[in-house]
Amino acid sequence: MAEIRKGDTVKVIAGKEKGKSGRVLEVLREDGRVRVEKLMTVKRHQKKGRSQANPEGGILEMAGTIAISSVMVVGKDEKPVRREKIGRELGAKEKARLQKRKTAAK
């Protein structure tokens, strides 16, 4: 199973956002949840003067969290990644996360 990290592209496999994909903004390991860009948006009502970022207050929209078990890591081609390792590609000087896919033999 691939470990989910910030910046990964994931696809939702369960829940009301099933089938949608996005980039991971934050991983909350203690809660077992992830925050995915443009998915599970929630509205928060904020009073005037409560925040330096939004001093006028109002209704804010932000990304909610999704359970880690409800998402899977996908590659650039939107296919699931089964295994990954840290290593060097041929001719590369820096280490990177290399992804492998399990192909079904028929």
Swiss-Prot record:
InterPro entries: KOW (IPR005824), Rib_uL2_dom2 (IPR014722), Ribosomal_uL24 (IPR003256), Ribosomal_uL24_CS (IPR005825), Ribosomal_uL24_KOW (IPR041988), Translation_prot_SH3-like_sf (IPR008991). The keyword Manganese does not apply. It comes from the Bacteria. GO terms for cellular component: ribonucleoprotein complex; ribosome. One of its GO terms (molecular function) is structural constituent of ribosome. PROSITE patterns: RIBOSOMAL_L24. SMART domains: KOW. Belongs to the universal ribosomal protein uL24 family. Part of the 50S ribosomal subunit. This is Large ribosomal subunit protein uL24. It comes from Anaeromyxobacter dehalogenans (strain 2CP-1 / ATCC BAA-258). The gene is rplX.
